[in-house]
């Protein structure tokens, strides 16, 4: 039993280290926007939802257009977000873009978390 706990602890440590390296939160992204840091924000939600509201400066790249890689940049961090915490679309997009050689992070909680934090929404 002790071996299992030690094994789980090591796996948990690695999981959370990886999670922190490849995810960021809405408040952190908002600060990056305010400071005009060089990041690309990619909204992978559908175009109708994007038009209803999105993160300032975000580029809409819905799933049917992922193959174009439109808006992604190789020289900076690309931050991906989708609908909400339980939406895995952002993670799938991030994995696909990383496979193509792009530096990526995913925004925790998606657009829903952005709204819940009362951050600026552009229409």
Regions found by a protein language model. Give the residues of each.
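Short, hinge-like loop/turn segments at secondary-structure boundaries
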Residues: 59, 77, 121-123
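Catalytic cysteine-centered active loop of the rhodanese-like fold, especially the PTP/DSP P-loop
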Residues: 67, 72-115
